[in-house]
């Protein structure tokens, strides 16, 4: 299957989960993540605010705050097709923008560079065990991560993990997958 077909097939599976099923999976993935060494060692974490059928990241964000971690969320720049991350400490620092996305208000948040973050939780829809992913099709994270060494993880239910994701030269794999069954260290190449 090509990327578009895989994205569509897995999105449909995710949308069929009941709220209770989804919540139970999110609790398990959050537990796996926050017990991991990569989480424990991180002081500043980049994470996406969930929208629609995506895995809800609120429990992860709030766990980070309780543990004294700095939490950063992205703001998309659609003209430049890039991401800028901002540290936020309260949901009042967010605004609703296009596609009903919640993003930081730049005037109410501190912008951070990728090198300041210790861990980035990268969103996606389909993944393989080498860490390659199919996101939402904009390439924002691949551009953001190009040439960077930041630790990366993605939240991925086992139904989202396939044998092989079709790749292109600009695709940047993640280091680890966090599923409801545990942490998968990706084998790149």
Protein language model features and the residues they cover:
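N-terminal active-site beta-alpha-beta segment that forms phosphate/nucleotide-binding
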Residues: 1-115
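Conserved phosphate- and dinucleotide-binding cores of soluble alpha/beta proteins
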Residues: 79-189
């Amino acid at each position: 299957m090509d990327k578009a077909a895989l994205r569509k097939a897995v999105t449909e599976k995710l949308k069929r989960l009941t709220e209770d099923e989804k919540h139970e999976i999110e609790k398990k993935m959050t537990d796996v993540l926050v017990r991991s060494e990569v989480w424990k060692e991180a002081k500043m974490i980049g994470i996406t605010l969930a929208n629609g059928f995506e895995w809800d990241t609120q429990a992860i964000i709030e766990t980070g705050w309780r543990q004294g971690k700095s939490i950063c969320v992205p703001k998309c720049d659609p003209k430049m097709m890039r991401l800028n991350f901002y540290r936020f400490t309260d949901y009042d620092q967010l605004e609703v923008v296009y596609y009903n996305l919640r993003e930081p208000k730049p005037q109410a948040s501190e912008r951070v560079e990728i090198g300041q973050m210790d861990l980035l939780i990268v969103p996606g829809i389909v993944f393989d065990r080498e860490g390659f992913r199919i996101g939402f099709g904009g390439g924002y994270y691949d551009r953001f991560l190009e040439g960077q060494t930041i630790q990366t993880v993605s939240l991925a239910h086992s139904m989202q993990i396939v044998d092989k994701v079709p790749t292109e030269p600009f695709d940047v794999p993640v280091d680890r997958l966090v599923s409801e069954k545990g942490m998968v260290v990706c084998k790149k190449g």
